[in-house]
Amino acid sequence: MKKVGKIIWMVALIAIIVLIGVVGFGYYKKATFTSQNPVATMEVENFGTIKMELYPDQAPEAVANFIKLANNGFYDGTTFHRIVKDFMIQTGSKDGDGKTGAKLSNLKDGGENKDYSIKGEFLANGVTNTIKFEEGTVAMARADYTQYSSNLKEKSYNSACSQFFIMTKENTNLNGYYAAFGKVIEGMDIVHNIENVEVKATEGQENTENAEVSTPVNVPKVTSIRVETFGIDYGMPNTLTPFDYTSWLYKQYGIGQ
């Protein structure tokens, strides 16, 4: 009887030790767990693959927006419509004209077919973002309405939608003024190959002084962009009503629409 009791006591002790070990490991795992940043894979027709690590800790709105658009197929078939050597390559315009972007319906099924924008996540707009604009940095493109009025600074800062650009060279002038949200981790050679395609002056500006020569003659096409989130749901971005520059202009000059 004594022997049986001893065996039962030993089994109970082992069970307690195992339980403590399991619970302890669980707490250790939780304490040391670090989530893996999402990684976007972009396929560019006739060029190759570009992989970009995204940083939700720096620009959560931009990252959530990008993930939804990419994984819903919005970027498939878009083009690198603006290419400036020793500066950046830009894509994400719905019609490839640099003027059009995504709609709310591109973010989710059942969304309205309306334009939208997101908050600019950078220091000048009151958001801490420490990503520097160096070779390979990925950032949201936005409008600059301050050329029309200095009062439109905030409207400019919060005008990003779907267009983004990849830096091909460091440019510190952009630090704190544009929402950087990622970095190329593979395929920087592909980025430079795109950067080096033949370009021409923007349509309508051919004979204009200081016209930007940035429109590719043979436009590089994005086949697809998909983002691996490693099981983490980054949710929906908080969308804003975009600034209607045309209506503002009419109002400024008292012109009826």
Name the predicted role of every residue range.
Residues 1-257:
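Cyclophilin-like peptidyl-prolyl cis-trans isomerases
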